[in-house]
């Protein structure tokens, strides 16, 4: 059996840093343009994918806060089709706007 020391650094880094299970949540409430969803482990500024298994809805949303163990999300596109069946999948990434990275309430040059 191989130990981690026998695996090249770039491959080892990919193995150690990868998610082995895909975390998903579900939309629980929609008020205006604000979505509430139960999604374990998300962070403020993180992008999530919104998908409906029963139609072609697929768009991104940003986590902007939390309320009573639910994530508050703002969709980045047309909301038509969002329902209680909408799955929320965190990406682990933040918004990238050209030369600036915006993530977790901070802004820095790329």
From Swiss-Prot:
Induction: Temperature seems to play the major role in regulation of transcription of the lcrE-containing operon of pYV, whereas Ca(2+) concentration has only a moderate effect at 37 degrees Celsius, and no effect at room temperature. GO terms for biological process: ATP metabolic process; proton transmembrane transport. The keyword ATP-binding does not apply. Keywords: Plasmid. It holds the Pfam family ATP-synt_ab_N. InterPro entries: ATPase_F1/V1/A1_a/bsu_N. This is Uncharacterized 12.2 kDa protein in lcrE 5'region.
